[in-house]
C-alpha cells in the first residue's frame, strides 16, 4: 500500500533570491553563458541609440526622448477575452489621476513570500499537480507519474489569459514554460542519470493548461472548478499532437521519419508569452526550444550552420546538463532526426473553447525564440502581430495578414495567420542634428531620429530575401533577417501598441 504524503511547499534546496544560475540552467539552458548565436555584422540598436544621443548633445540638453514609429494600427475590437491591466503609483498613497487602482506600492524587499499592498489579499487559484481533467488523481509528490501529470496542472506558469464564459465563470489559459527537475524530484542530478519516468513527467509538465474557474460569492475571489463535467479543461504537453500550417508546412526541412508529411508534430516547448486574438483564441510563443535537443555534433554538416544560428550546440558534449528527452523519445537526438528542431520555435494558436481541436503551429509568423505576440487590427481590419526574438542581438518582427478579420466567422478567421507578409525591423537615426531642437518641428528629412522601417521578408507566395525560398524564410527566419540587415536588439520581449495612437 502506498502512503499518501501531505501536500507541501516545494523544497527550495538552498536556492534563494533573484535570477540564480540554477534558474538560468533550467529556464533557458544557460543562454547568456554561451556566445550569442547572431554573428552577423548587422547594426546594433545600442550603437544607433548612442549615436543619436551624441548628435543631440544629451549632456548639454539634459534630457532626450526617442520615439520609434511603426505601422499605425487601430486597437482591436473588444476581444472575446483579454489580459487585465492595473496602474500603480510610485510616489505614495495618492494615485495618479488616471490610475484604476488606489494602493501604496510594496517597497522593495527580499522576503521569501508573496507580498501585496496593504488592504489587499492574494489567493492561490491553481497550482502544480492540481487535477485538471475529470478523473485526474490528486497530486502526490512522492508518487508522481507521467500518466497522472498529463491530467494535472503543469509546472512553472508564464503567460496567463482570461476567457469569460458568463458573469460568474471563465477559462484560464496558462503557459507551462519549463521544469525545475531539481525541485520536482528528490535526489535529482541531471537528465543523463534521471529515472526514465521522471523524464516523461517533465515532458508532461511542459506545455499549457485550460482550466475553468468561478467567482466566490461577491468577494472578488476566483477559485478552480473541481467538480462537474468541466468540458473545456485540458492539458497540452510536449507530446500533444499538433498541426503545422502555413506556407512552410510540408517542406522537406520539416519532414522526419515519424512525420514524412512535414505537417504533424508532437508537442510544444518552453512557451513563454502570448496574446489573444480578436476571435477568441490564444497565441502561445515557443521560446528556448533549443535546450531540449542533443546530438548536434552528429547532425549532417549542411544543417549545422542553421542549428548554431538557433543556439543549438554542434560540437562538444551536447548531452551534459541536458534534460535528455532523447532517452525516452529519440526525435530529440539530432544525430538521428536532424529536422526535428525545425518543428519548434513557432507561435501556436489554440482555441480554449474547442478542446478536441488540435493546436496549430503557424509557420507564416516565422521561427525563432518567440517571447510574445501582440495582436492589433489595422484600419482596414487586417490582423497585425508584433513579435520579439528573445535572444541577445536578435530582432523584432511583424506579421500583417492578407485577409480581413470577420467578426463571428470562425472558419474564415482560422485562416488569417496562414497568409500575409512577415517583416523584420531596421532602426535608423539620421536626422540633421542641428534641426533636433526639442520644439517638435520635423527636420528636413521628415522624421525624427529614432525612426525605423519594416523590411519585408516574404509573403505566402514570394520571398523577398535573395537565396531563400518562402519556406526557408519561415523556417530559418533568423538567417533571412541577418541577410537583409535587420537591427540587432537587446533581447526584445513584449511589444505593445498605444491605445491612443495605435503606434508601437
Where are each of the predicted segments found?
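Beta-rich catalytic cores
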Residues: 156, 270-271, 343, 369, ...
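Beta-propeller blade signature
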Residues: 206-214, 343-352, 400
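Carboxylate/His-rich catalytic cores and anion/metal-binding grooves
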Residues: 196-240, 271, 275-332
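Blade-edge beta-strand/turn elements of extracellular beta-propeller
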Residues: 111-127, 135-148, 218-262, 350-368, ...
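Beta-propeller fold recognition
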Residues: 196-202, 206, 219-234, 394-480, ...
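N-terminal secretory signal peptides
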Residues: 1-53
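N-terminal export signals
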Residues: 51, 57-84
Amino acid at each position: 500500500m502506498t502512503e499518501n504524503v501531505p501536500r507541501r511547499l516545494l523544497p527550495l534546496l538552498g536556492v534563494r533570491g533573484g535570477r540564480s544560475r540554477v534558474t538560468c540552467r533550467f529556464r533557458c539552458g544557460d543562454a547568456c553563458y554561451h556566445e550569442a548565436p547572431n554573428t552577423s555584422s548587422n547594426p546594433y540598436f545600442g550603437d544607433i541609440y548612442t549615436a543619436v544621443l551624441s548628435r543631440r548633445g544629451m549632456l548639454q540638453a539634459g534630457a532626450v526622448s526617442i520615439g520609434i514609429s511603426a505601422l499605425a494600427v487601430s486597437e482591436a475590437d473588444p476581444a472575446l477575452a483579454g489580459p487585465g491591466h492595473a496602474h500603480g503609483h510610485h510616489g505614495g498613497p495618492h494615485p495618479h489621476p488616471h490610475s484604476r487602482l488606489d494602493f501604496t506600492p510594496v517597497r522593495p524587499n527580499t522576503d521569501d513570500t508573496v507580498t501585496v499592498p496593504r488592504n489587499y489579499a492574494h489567493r492561490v487559484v491553481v497550482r502544480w499537480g492540481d487535477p485538471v481533467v475529470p478523473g485526474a488523481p490528486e497530486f502526490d509528490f512522492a508518487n508522481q507519474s507521467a500518466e497522472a501529470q498529463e491530467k494535472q496542472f503543469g509546472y512553472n506558469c508564464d503567460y496567463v489569459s482570461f476567457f469569460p464564459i458568463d458573469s460568474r465563470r471563465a477559462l484560464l489559459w496558462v503557459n507551462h514554460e519549463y521544469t525545475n527537475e531539481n525541485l520536482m524530484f528528490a535526489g535529482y542530478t541531471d537528465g543523463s542519470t534521471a529515472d526514465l519516468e521522471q523524464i516523461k513527467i517533465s515532458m508532461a509538465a511542459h506545455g499549457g493548461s485550460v482550466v475553468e474557474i468561478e467567482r466566490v460569492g461577491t468577494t472578488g475571489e476566483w477559485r478552480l472548478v473541481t467538480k462537474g463535467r468541466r468540458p473545456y479543461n485540458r492539458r497540452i504537453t510536449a507530446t500533444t499532437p499538433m498541426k503545422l500550417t502555413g506556407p512552410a508546412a510540408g517542406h522537406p526541412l520539416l519532414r522526419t521519419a515519424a512525420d514524412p508529411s512535414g505537417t504533424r508534430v508532437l508537442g510544444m516547448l518552453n512557451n513563454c508569452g502570448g496574446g489573444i486574438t480578436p476571435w477568441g483564441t490564444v497565441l502561445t510563443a515557443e521560446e528556448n526550444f533549443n535546450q531540449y535537443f542533443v546530438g548536434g555534433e552528429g547532425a549532417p554538416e549542411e544543417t549545422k550552420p542553421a542549428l548554431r544560428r538557433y543556439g543549438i550546440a554542434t560540437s562538444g558534449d551536447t548531452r551534459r546538463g541536458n534534460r535528455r528527452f532523447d532517452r525516452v523519445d529519440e526525435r530529440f537526438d539530432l544525430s538521428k532526426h536532424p529536422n526535428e528542431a525545425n518543428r519548434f520555435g513557432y507561435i501556436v494558436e489554440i482555441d480554449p473553447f474547442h478542446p478536441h481541436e488540435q493546436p496549430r503551429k503557424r509557420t507564416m509568423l516565422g521561427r525563432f525564440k518567440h517571447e510574445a505576440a501582440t495582436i492589433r487590427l489595422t484600419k482596414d481590419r487586417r490582423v497585425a502581430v508584433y513579435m520579439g526574438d528573445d535572444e541577445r542581438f536578435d530582432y523584432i518582427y511583424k506579421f500583417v495578414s492578407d485577409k480581413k478579420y470577420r467578426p463571428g466567422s470562425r472558419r474564415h478567421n482560422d485562416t488569417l495567420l496562414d497568409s500575409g507578409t512577415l517583416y523584420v525591423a531596421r532602426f535608423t537615426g539620421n536626422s540633421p542634428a542641428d534641426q533636433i531642437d526639442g520644439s517638435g518641428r520635423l527636420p528636413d528629412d521628415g522624421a525624427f531620429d529614432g525612426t525605423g522601417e519594416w523590411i519585408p521578408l516574404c509573403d505566402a507566395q514570394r520571398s523577398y530575401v535573395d537565396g531563400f525560398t518562402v519556406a526557408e524564410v519561415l523556417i530559418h527566419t533568423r538567417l533571412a533577417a541577418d541577410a537583409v540587415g535587420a537591427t540587432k536588439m537587446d533581447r526584445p520581449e513584449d511589444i505593445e501598441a498605444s491605445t491612443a495612437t495605435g503606434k508601437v
